[in-house]
Amino acid sequence: MPQKFYSTKSPGQFVDLKEAVLRSLPSDNGLYMPEYIDPLPAHFWENWRDLSLPEIGFEVAKMIFRDSVPEKQLEKIVHQSANFPAPLVTLKEREHILELFHGPTLAFKDFGARFMARLMGW
């Protein structure tokens, strides 16, 4: 079933993915939220440490977008959006930082902006 999205200020009013992506913000200036977010399956949690960042992103995106985007297309969008490193750097024991500035513009927004652009292009 395709995902529907609602405004945080008008929870009873739903739009489809296309409208949510192309409008960006609802007319009431809320934020679009998915109606449902399915939990990640047990096999994901059993194997997540062995997955790449794009693989993790794809698994999460499937739970959010459901059938709104064909799975093969969604996988392509995610892999094209996160095709640069995001190293987890250890600062000291039990203290780490995820560096999100290794993309084309050297800013954390590269992940989201690239994903949004590819989703809009789809």
Q: How should each PLM-predicted stretch be described?
A:
Residues 1-122:
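PLP-dependent amino-acid enzyme catalytic core
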